[in-house]
Design a protein with these regions (language model features):
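P-loop NTPase switch module centered on the Walker A-proximal segment
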Residues: 1-101, 105-107, 141, 148-152, ...
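P-loop NTPase catalytic nucleotide-binding module
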Residues: 1-16, 34-35, 103-218
Length: 218
């Protein structure tokens, strides 16, 4: 039986928490015993001495993790606009992208460049809003900004409470209203999903995986 591989790029404007998220993914999948830190120079994907010294990524690096029988190649790209060429070269190798945006600073210049590049490459993406616990965090404002850039509907998957506080919490959205919003968004952008919905193939929560799979493959 052949192995399944997915190449997932992590992209963001500098200082949005890109490498920190990568470290957490490696930790949660058991690749590293302790999550590294950019500030302390212990991040697994910051291999160059200049990266450890300056606390920024200057070239694309890759780390692999296993999850539920799937090999995930996490591709950590530089966030500084001076190294945008590294990001652009990595896109041809990606299956999906995670775009990280700070809940405090919001959409920044390089964020817009990244979103446009992903549109041109026709790459599916997940937006991860980071720094929810920082003072001034406003995820709804960030979603509104991103919606003006996106060519398809943006659907928040979680509800955040007490933003800007250490006691913040996030929970997955559920319920009929969310079910209807997901189905409507998919039908607007994916003819195959609309056809399946109209033929009663997709009507219930348990079929969301099928809806999303159709959307991503298309």
């Amino acid at each position: 039986m052949s192995k399944i591989y997915h190449n997932i790029g992590v992209l963001a404007h500098v200082d949005s928490g890109k490498t920190t998220l990568t470290e957490q993914l490696l930790y949660l999948t058991g690749v590293v015993r302790n999550a590294g830190s950019v500030d302390s120079g212990t991040a697994a994907t910051d291999n160059l001495s200049i990266e450890r010294k300056r606390g920024i990524s200057v070239r694309t690096s890759t780390a692999s993790a296993e999850w539920n029988g799937v090999t995930i190649n996490i591709i950590d790209t530089p966030g500084h606009i001076d190294f945008a060429g590294e990001v652009e070269r990595s896109l041809c190798a990606l299956d999906y992208a995670i775009v990280i945006v700070s809940a405090v600073e919001g959409v920044r210049a390089h964020t817009e460049n990244i979103m446009r590049a992903l549109d041109e490459a026709n790459l599916p993406r997940l937006v991860f809003i980071n720094k929810i616990d920082r003072a001034g965090a406003d995820s709804e404002a960030v979603i509104a900004e991103l919606s003006s850039l996106a060519k398809c509907p943006l659907l928040p998957l979680t509800v955040c409470r007490d933003e800007g506080l250490d006691s913040y919490s996030c929970a997955m959205k559920t319920g009929d209203d969310f079910s209807a919003a997901v189905t409507e968004a998919l039908c607007e952008t994916c003819p195959e999903a609309e056809e399946a919905f109209l033929s009663d193939e997709i009507l219930h929560n348990e079929n969301y995986a099928l809806i999303v799979q159709i959307w991503l493959i298309s």
